[in-house]
Amino acid sequence: RVAGYSDLRSVDAPPLGKPSRSLTLGIGMDMMRGYVWTLGGQAYPKADTIDLARNETVDIVFANRSMMHMAHPMHLHGNLFAIAGADGGIVLKDTVLVGPTVSMPVRLHAANPGRWLLHCHNDYHMMSGMMRELQIRA
């Protein structure tokens, strides 16, 4: 048996408030434009910035809609997000593996202001557009 996120526990994970909103970011590939990977239907650098207020709590759902049947390690710079375990506990991570055809919800408490990248850690996907800028206002 392979351990999953629901098997992990954080010793000192802070309680998270209710989210102010939910964002679904589909993971996909735009075959009409060639080898272009997308996040939320948009490819970097022409993708819209995701704008958050400092201390805003949002749910982000990474929805792997790629037809290529591959996993995507989604990574956020500068902040941590929470992944819920089966028992209701949470673990804080900066990267989550989103398997083929899986929707993976995470909860982000935007505590660290700045402009941060959210991207696939498969470098060739990131370099082909699977990246967004996340701005947390001070």
Residue ranges and their predicted role:
Residues 1-69, 109-115, 122-138:
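Extended terminal and domain-junction accessory segments
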Residues 17, 46-52, 76-113, 138:
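Extracytoplasmic beta-sandwich strand-turn segments characteristic of Greek-key/jelly-roll folds
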